[in-house]
Amino acid sequence: MPSAPHYSSKYYDDKYEYRHVILPSEISSLIPRDVLLTEDECRKLGIRQSDGWEHYANHKPEPHILLFRRPHSGIPNDVDYL
């Protein structure tokens, strides 16, 4: 059984909430490089997040790291701000 994805803490700029997900090699080997996944495809691979997260980029030097974002309506007081 593959190990589970690792989820970063959330971080923010003035428009988006961000996080990255580090996939175990068993899962990352199933994803073609330079492909952005839909929310449904992410769930089928075992990536579990609340609704609205967009897979907007892959970390080129480390393709097992997927970058996600979603719009926010305000930044919580206890989080990192870019």
UniProtKB/Swiss-Prot annotation:
InterPro entries referenced in this protein's UniProt entry, alphabetically: Cyclin-dep_kinase_reg-sub, Cyclin-dep_kinase_reg-sub_sf
UniProt cross-references to Gene3D superfamilies, sorted A to Z: Cyclin-dependent kinase, regulatory subunit
Keywords: Cell cycle, Cell division
GO biological process: cell division; regulation of mitotic cell cycle
Pfam families with a match to the protein in the record: CKS
GO molecular function terms attached to this record: cyclin-dependent protein serine/threonine kinase activator activity; histone binding; protein kinase binding; ubiquitin binding
SMART domains: CKS (SM01084)
Highest rank taxon of the organism: Eukaryota
Keyword Cell cycle among record annotations: yes
A single GO cellular-component term on record: cyclin-dependent protein kinase holoenzyme complex
Subunit structure comment from the entry: Forms a homohexamer that can probably bind six kinase subunits.
Stated role: Binds to the catalytic subunit of the cyclin dependent kinases and is essential for their biological function.
UniProt family annotation: Belongs to the CKS family.
Protein name: Cyclin-dependent kinases regulatory subunit
Species of the source: Dictyostelium discoideum (Social amoeba)
Organism ancestry: Eukaryota, Amoebozoa, Evosea, Eumycetozoa, Dictyostelia
